[in-house]
Structure formats: C-alpha cells, structure tokens
C-alpha cells in the first residue's frame, strides 16, 4: 500500500491504471483508487472480442468505481502492430513481443484520448512472488527462491523492458509499485516456505501468489471482488484473446505460409545467438535486424517456462494451465479460508 501511495501523492501529473482484470493490475488499481477522488480514477483495458480478461477488468472497475475504458480491437489490428512494437521495444523475444502488443496499443490509445501521463501497472509481481504458472512444478523451496531472484535479476530484459518502452514511447510515464525496493526487500526477507505456494498443504486447490492473496483477504477483504482476488493466473499475452483462439495461435496462423520449408531453414542458419526455431521467432528476428543489425545479444536468451517440456512460451500450453481451466469449467472453487 505504501509503495502505491507514495507514487500517487508525489505525482504532479494526471494518472491512470492499466487494468487487465488479473490479480496484480486489479490490486494496484484498487489501492490507487483509495488515493484518488471517488469516480475520478481512469482505468484502461484492452483485448480482442471474447478476450478472457475483459469481463474481470470491468468487474474490478465497477467495484472500485473507476472511469473505465475498454478497448476492443480486431485480430488483424493486433497483428499489424507487431513491426512497430518490435522497433519500439528493441526486442525479438517471443514472449516479450506477444505481451508488448497489447501494452503498446493501450498506451497509444491513452496518449491520444486521455490527459493521463502517469500510468500505473501491476508488473513485477510474478517475478517477485513466483506467480507464473510454471512455478506449480517447482521441485523445492530452494529452487523456488532461486528462480524468483533469477527472474528479478533479468527483468530488465523482459517484463520491465516491455512495460517501460511500450508506455514511454507514447510520451507516458510508467509506475511499477511491485518493484519498489523496500517492498521487494521486505517480501524476499520472508521465509521461503511461506512464499512458496506449493507448501500450502491444507489447500484443496493450490493457487499461485497464495501469500499475497491471503494477506489481502485477511487485512482488506473488501478491496477486490472475491472471484478476482482468487482468480488463477492468466498471462496478459494470453488474456487479450479468447480461450477458443489464443493470441499466439493467431500470430502463428498468419505466419505459417510466409516461409517455405527450405527458406525457413536457410534463414535460421545465419543466426548463431538465439537461433530461431519457429516461423514466429524468425519473423520477429528479421524485423529486429532491419532496425538493429548485429545487436541480437541485447537479449541474452528466449524467455521460457521452466520445469516442463513445452516448446512454446504461452502459459496455455502448460499442463497445469489446462488442468486449472478444466476445473474452472466444472465449477470447482478454491478454499479461500485454507
């Protein structure tokens, strides 16, 4: 709360919140709303028709009484933005590019249709708390702690790069309270066995970021709607699209006919660092090279989920995601009192 408060009261420019409907952006928006005159906080969400995040963002905006704008764009509008996104973020990492498109387009909208200049977001929480879905497969406490700190150490190559550049390229200023130095140090000082949600033996349905959720439940139970507070993780790059056709599938469908098999192989061979293995990666790399030739080592590696054998970085490819999605469809709920 303090990391949000000081960024609100010290801001001399009009502010707004990116509100995806996930736990992190919803939590930040709800806390910001406490320090803004009632009904004056601007929140923005973006997605394609049927995007899984949109209904939750609307639910939160009504709960916190924000002035909410929902931006719905077509699959083609998302896809067409990729070249300018890669130019502005200066990255070809698969996950970063996918997630940056929504960020870039919503920031562009804000810059053109709003007087807000300071933009709050929920980035950094997944790295700090072990909130990515693949952490469910983390083998032990020591590895959990190591992986969180590894992600934080490398965050400037991925999520923070995405958030900062997609927002700042439109003349806006990003605010990321989850990465407040004091908050990060305090959170990491907690015993690993508390931070690792896989240790929650009493839960019938383990959920990522359990400690963060439970602390809200106990200290400010009215802060968020219960089904948002206990909503399982949905990556922003997936949540902008529907479950019927994910954003990564939309991209790949449009690119599959772009290269012949021989053309694809020959073009991939010229790269030694982070060699492309898919047409999507090759497409991003060629766009990157057209602006930043011989600068490929600026990205040390491709971001990928650990503790699994998936070959695509989308969380929707993970078995744990499929299991949780199946459970939600059968109306199984999480025991919030565990």
Go through each PLM region and give its residues.
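ATP-dependent adenylate-handling active sites, centered on carboxylate activation for C-N bond formation
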Residues: 1-219, 236-249, 265-277, 281-338
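A short alpha-helix-loop-beta-strand transition element characteristic
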Residues: 222-232
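N-terminal, charged/glycine-rich beta-strand/loop interface patches
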Residues: 255
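Surface/interface-facing alpha-helical segments and adjacent flexible terminal/loop regions used
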Residues: 258-265
């Amino acid at each position: 709360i303090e990391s949000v408060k000081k960024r609100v009261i010290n801001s001399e420019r009009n502010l707004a919140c990116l509100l995806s409907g996930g736990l992190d952006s919803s939590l930040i928006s709800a806390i910001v709303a406490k320090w803004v005159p009632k009904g004056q906080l601007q929140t923005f969400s973006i997605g394609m028709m049927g995007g899984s995040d949109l209904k939750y963002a609307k639910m939160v905006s009504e709960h916190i009484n924000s002035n909410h704008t929902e931006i719905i764009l077509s699959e083609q509008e998302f896809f067409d933005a990729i070249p300018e996104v890669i130019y502005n973020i200066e990255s070809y990492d698969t996950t970063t590019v996918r997630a940056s498109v929504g960020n870039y387009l919503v920031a562009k909208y804000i810059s053109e249709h709003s007087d807000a200049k300071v933009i709050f977001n929920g980035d950094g929480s997944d790295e700090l708390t072990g909130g990515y879905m693949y952490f469910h497969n983390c083998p032990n406490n020591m590895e959990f702690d190591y992986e969180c700190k590894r992600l934080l150490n490398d965050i400037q190559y991925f999520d923070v790069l995405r958030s900062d550049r997609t927002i700042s390229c439109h003349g806006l200023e990003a605010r990321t309270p989850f990465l407040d130095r004091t908050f990060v140090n305090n959170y990491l000082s907690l015993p690993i066995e508390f931070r690792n949600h896989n240790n929650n033996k009493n839960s019938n349905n383990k959920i990522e970021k359990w400690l963060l959720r439970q602390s809200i439940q106990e200290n400010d139970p009215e802060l968020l709607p219960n089904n948002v507070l206990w909503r399982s993780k949905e990556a922003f790059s997936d949540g902008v699209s529907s479950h019927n056709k994910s954003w990564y599938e939309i991209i790949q469908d449009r690119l599959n006919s772009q290269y012949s098999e021989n053309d694809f192989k020959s073009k991939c061979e010229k790269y030694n660092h982070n060699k492309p293995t898919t047409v999507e990666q090759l497409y991003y790399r060629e766009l990157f090279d057209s602006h930043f030739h011989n600068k490929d080592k600026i990205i040390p590696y491709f971001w990928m989920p650990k503790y699994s054998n998936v070959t695509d970085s989308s969380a929707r490819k993970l078995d744990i995601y499929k299991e949780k999605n199946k459970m939600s469809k059968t109306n199984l709920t999480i025991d919030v009192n565990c």
